[in-house]
Amino acid sequence: MEKIKRVIFQQLLYMLLPVLMSIIIGDPFELSPVGGNKFRPVKNEIAPYKVVMENWRGDNKSRLGLGRLQFVDEVFGPESLEFDLLGRGPYAGLADGRVVRWMGDGIGWETFSLVTHNWSEKICAKGVHSTTPKQWKFESHCGRPLGLRFDKKTGDLYIADAYYGLLVVGPEGGIAKPLATHVQGKPILFANDLDIHNNGSIFFTDTSQRYNRVNHFLIMLEGEATGRLLRYDPPTRETHVVLENLAFPNGVQLSKDQSSLFFTETTNCRLMRFWLEGPKSGKTEVIANLPGFPDNVRANGKGQIWVAIDCCRTKVQEVLVNHPWTRSVYFRLPVPMQYLARLAGMRMYTVISLFDEEGRVVDVLEDKEGDVMKLMSEVREVNGKLWIGTVAHNHIATLSYP
């Protein structure tokens, strides 16, 4: 009798197991990190992990770990940093929707600009919680300034805001004026970074046409490539599509002679170059494959560019990247994203790398244990010091260099 019961139980188990697995993978209760979204993973155009890591120049001294954290719990997610024509600053775009300016020890930080009249302290000012999910439902209301650039001719500050598009504010600050919120009749869903050409044109990235900033992780997990490089022309007030079908286009930096433009593709872990002039005009090329996921790119004034790179790649991620069906299953599991990332071997540490304009590595600084630097977003080299922003933490890091 016991044997019969055991056989019946096993048969029921075999019958129910596929049903149970289909329920888990189908995620009908939307318990997974991608629940409630039309998650459609595709294969990425990414260089092989082994090849990239074998040729990558590391930092055995972990010099980035010698950095100093400043303004702790005074600034919230300072993604991009900028200094004005008089050398004042840094200016920083914060997760609570403000652009702030450092006024010195006697005064501290002051609000320099807002990207919308909608901003209110009651709704938007979450302090140290601004970089947590508590702020996410307010981001589209309050704004999220990402890229910052001063026009060297006028002193105006141009802002790429994730929700309000491309904006500009005068040297005295105030409410920023929107310049580009739509292109080809469709809204700019995720303006990210920008740079200003000597002819006045502003080049900026629109990271995705499907997901906004709050859902930025879905862009990477899915591998979707609906991002664009855009150009705004002040005389005509028109916005044009320069490049499309990009996988999480992020940081933007014009070359020293303005003949080309560098930008990062975060999902594909690479630094790209688009030619504006010369025999290669209109062509795009990969100039560096990276060990992790790049954010902003900034010139140091010497014909070299800094790239901030986070969460270095792993062998498990290589499998997920090359086989979209594995992502479809893995990220539909009813497990919080932080644990899935940990299981995939994702380490939260930062690499910053200095390249020449041909894509050759000049220097690499790492914080291999992530003791000081995590989720760094931008590097500015100013007067023998590196100023390093972060999208997700409440401080600015500095480090003497070289």
Question: Where do the PLM segments sit?
Answer:
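Short, conserved, GDST-rich strand-edge loop motifs in beta-rich repeat architectures
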Residues: 36-41, 204-224, 310-347, 398
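Beta-propeller domains
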Residues: 41-43, 48-59, 85-128, 165, ...
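Surface loop/turn motifs at the tips and blade-to-blade linkers of beta-strand repeat domains
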Residues: 69-75, 113-116, 136-141, 179-186, ...
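Residue-level detector of Asp-centered blade-edge/turn motifs that repeat once per structural unit
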Residues: 84-87, 150-154, 196-199, 256-258, ...
